[in-house]
């Protein structure tokens, strides 16, 4: 087992930092006054970009690591070792893993990757309200509850999803997951959280058996208890549940495509193998970015088209859900590293983060073409559609 894995396994301890209390806004938001925006987490530059969904103009960005040096200085020796090892595994600094806006559009919640914490910011005042360290050494994907009171984040090396009170930053509960939990999503009705795990990505493909459980975990959002689990044959990468509540689409580690999975039957019912680009053909599986051939999956608003992001292929494939047939491809320059897909609020566009190009590509589901490309910060990854209070936009840089 790699030295990094041994140290991390031995050093996983409870390291949650008590956060200062901050009262949550109790006033109901004036939803009609809020503005539809796309949040883009710029992982290396430690900022979140705001893109206007009406016209795709950049509205600016917000610095979410104003306390970077302080946070590093606060680390004890074990935490600092974990930070450096995780930084190596991630391929460098990764300060923004995920982000969400509060229902009133005035607070920004951020999962801060290699800092292994979650922070809340008052946008208007440009003030950090609290930060809370998670168990383990890396804060991963996150999801905000529909009512805005809970922010659930994957504590990657601790193999748990931790639920945070957004008013105070306190960790109120956690749920066990598979090995190296990754994505979190609330169900459409808000009753459940679905967490998926990817396994230890530092191990080579030949040791896939040692990567741990590749598990989809269904958690009751009210009790924060696990109600059901499913095991898949490979690490579960970007995924989504169709409106029928049973059809699960997922990209898997090493698969140049995705699978369709029946949750009720507990089995894969279809596998879509996508074409390799010329550059991708030269890569060995152990050279895929953290085991991912494809890393980004979204569904059009009408449910007719999947946006399958070909990370090693430098393209996006638009795939019909009826028959799982490729309908169109949008190709990017070699080395663009498309790394996430997110459907627009109106359901008509797929936003694709181009991590190495420092931009977001806007793809029209209906025409199968790129209609805009928006410059953002350094190494964009996660994108989230949100609503912001226009009054706070003046705080953006």
List PLM regions with ranges.
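Secretory targeting and sorting signals
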Residues: 1-24
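Predominantly soluble domains enriched in secretory-pathway, periplasmic, or organellar proteins
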Residues: 23-397
């Amino acid at each position: 087992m790699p030295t990094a894995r041994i140290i991390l396994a031995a050093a996983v301890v409870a390291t949650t930092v008590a956060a200062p209390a901050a009262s949550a806004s109790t006033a109901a938001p004036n939803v009609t006054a809020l503005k539809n925006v796309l949040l883009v987490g710029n992982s290396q530059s430690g900022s979140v970009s705001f893109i206007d969904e009406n016209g795709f103009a950049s509205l600016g960005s917000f610095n979410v690591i104003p306390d970077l040096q302080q946070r590093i200085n606060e680390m004890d020796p074990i935490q600092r070792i974990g930070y450096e090892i995780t930084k190596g595994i991630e391929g460098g600094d990764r300060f923004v893993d995920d982000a969400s806006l509060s229902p009133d559009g005035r607070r920004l919640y951020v999962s801060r990757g290699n800092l292994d914490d979650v922070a809340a910011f008052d946008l208007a005042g440009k003030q950090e309200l609290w930060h809370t360290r998670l168990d383990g050494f890396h804060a991963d994907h996150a999801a905000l509850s529909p009512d805005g009171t809970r922010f659930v984040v994957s504590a990657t090396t601790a193999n748990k999803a931790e639920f945070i009170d957004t008013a105070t930053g306190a960790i109120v509960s956690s749920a066990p997951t598979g090995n190296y939990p990754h994505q979190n999503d609330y169900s459409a009705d808000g009753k459940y959280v679905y967490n998926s795990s990817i396994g230890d990505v530092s191990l080579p493909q030949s040791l896939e058996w040692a990567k741990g459980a590749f598990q989809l975990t269904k958690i009751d959002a009210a009790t924060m208890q696990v109600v059901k689990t499913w095991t898949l044959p490979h690490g579960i990468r970007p995924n989504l549940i169709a409106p029928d509540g049973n059809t699960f689409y997922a990209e898997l580690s090493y698969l140049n495509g995705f699978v369709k999975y029946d949750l009720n039957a507990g089995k894969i019912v279809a596998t879509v193998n996508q074409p390799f680009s010329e550059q991708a053909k030269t890569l060995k599986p152990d050279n895929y970015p953290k085991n991912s051939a494809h890393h980004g999956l979204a569904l059009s608003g009408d449910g007719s088209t999947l946006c399958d992001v070909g990370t090693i292929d430098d393209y996006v494939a638009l795939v019909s859900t009826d028959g799982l047939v490729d309908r169109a491809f949008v190709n990017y320059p070699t080395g663009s590293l498309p790394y996430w897909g997110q459907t627009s609020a109106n359901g008509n566009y797929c936003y694709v983060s181009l991590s190495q190009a420092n931009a977001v590509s806007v793809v029209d589901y209906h025409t199968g073409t790129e209609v805009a490309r928006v410059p953002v910060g350094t190494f964009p990854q996660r994108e989230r559609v949100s609503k912001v209070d226009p009054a706070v936009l003046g705080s953006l840089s």
